[in-house]
């Protein structure tokens, strides 16, 4: 089984407002609250659905320090943490070869999802590039997690 109970969050955008310390402190407070809530509800797995950072080309060292400490916090709290690459995490909008999260790869329990991950009835999909979106409608998985902007697809 891929997971028993999962907690998800998305689009935290560390580094917003010019890498503002106030904003990054608010993000950190949210991560702490999120972990508390997830643990209260018995979640052993976390999926972050993309856009950890706000600026694909201007994330500063202070923001990177917030990233490391909060990813370590998530890694300690959950058995598995899947970190999906969103469009703001990628250097190029139309390809996934360079991202702002690669340096957290060695934090225990953290799994960076920069390519499609499909296992049993679960699919975890990073920012969709080129015409990959066409594959989604044919998927049979019960659970599909991703950072999506799909043409012609209404989401709610």
Language-model segments: residues:
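His/acidic metal-ligating clusters that form di-metal
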Residues: 41-42, 120-156
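Core catalytic region of metal-dependent phosphoesterases/phosphodiesterases
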Residues: 5, 12, 16-116
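Short, small-residue-rich loop/turn micro-motifs
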Residues: 10-13, 148
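Short boundary motifs at domain starts and secondary-structure transition points
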Residues: 1, 117-118
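Short, intrinsically disordered N-terminal pre-domain segments
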Residues: 1-2, 7
């Amino acid at each position: 089984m891929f997971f028993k109970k999962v907690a998800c969050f998305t689009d935290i955008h560390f580094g917003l407002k010019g890498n503002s310390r106030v904003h990054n402190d608010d993000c950190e407070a949210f991560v702490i609250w999120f972990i508390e809530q997830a643990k209260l509800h018995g979640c052993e797995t976390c999926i972050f659905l993309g856009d950890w950072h706000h600026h694909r080309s201007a994330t500063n060292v202070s923001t990177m320090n917030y990233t490391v400490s909060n990813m370590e916090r998530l890694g300690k709290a959950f058995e598995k943490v899947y970190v999906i690459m969103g469009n703001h995490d990628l250097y190029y909008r139309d390809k996934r070869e360079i991202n702002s999260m690669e340096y957290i790869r060695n934090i225990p329990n953290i799994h960076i999802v920069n390519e499609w991950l499909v296992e049993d009835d679960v699919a975890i999909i990073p920012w969709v590039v080129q015409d990959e979106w066409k594959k989604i409608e044919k998927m049979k998985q019960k659970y599909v997690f991703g950072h999506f902007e799909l043409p012609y697809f209404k989401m709610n």
